Regions:
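N-terminal signal peptide c-region/cleavage motif recognized by signal peptidases
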Residues: 17-22
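Bacterial N-terminal signal peptides that target proteins for export
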Residues: 1-8
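Residues in and immediately flanking transmembrane alpha helices
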Residues: 15-16, 117
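Bacterial N-terminal signal peptides
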Residues: 8-15
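Sequence context surrounding c-type heme c attachment/ligation sites in exported
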Residues: 24-60, 64-156
Length: 156
């Protein structure tokens, strides 16, 4: 539990420091903050994906830590990251976020809720072995992919 508290405090400090730093280094601060948040997701998902695929030796403690990191990230308010006027229609190549994300018919909040539920499930089984990890990771990937497919411009 102490590791989780230290990790939570560290992630919060990193987010605040990163957002403060981003504000003074060119580009839109909201876009920089959301990219940093997504990089933290990607880093932890990469560790878990490697274990689930057998590319990296499964380690229960490392899997639990990465899954708990993801769970902690879902508790950080992203409201300021997704400010209106920060899509690729307004900011061009600075972001791949499509304008539909802010549309009245956007399902992004629903997908985000599904992702949170999938991450909670993942965190509850990450230490239970490679097979359990892989099965739970699929739900997270499905939610991430749904949002990216609908609201992120494909890479060139």
């Amino acid at each position: 539990m102490n590791k989780f508290i230290v990790l939570t405090v560290s992630l919060a400090a990193l987010a605040v420091t990163g957002a403060s730093w981003a504000g003074g280094h060119g580009g839109n601060p909201a876009v920089k903050a959301r990219k940093a948040h997504m990089q933290l997701y990607a880093y932890n998902l990469g560790k878990l994906g490697g274990m689930a695929k057998g590319e990296v030796e499964y380690n229960a403690e490392a899997a639990e830590t990465a899954a708990n990191n993801l769970a902690t990230l879902t508790t950080v308010s992203q409201a300021g990251y997704w400010a209106p006027g920060t899509s690729n229609a307004e900011l061009g190549e600075e972001t791949r976020a499509l304008p539909g994300l802010w549309g009245a018919d956007s399902t992004a909040m629903q997908i985000g809720g599904e992702m949170g539920e999938a991450i909670t499930q993942l965190a509850s089984v990450a230490g239970d072995g490679q097979e359990a990890l892989g099965a739970a990771l699929g739900g997270v990937g499905k939610a991430c992919g749904a949002c990216h497919k609908a609201y992120r411009q494909p890479a060139n």
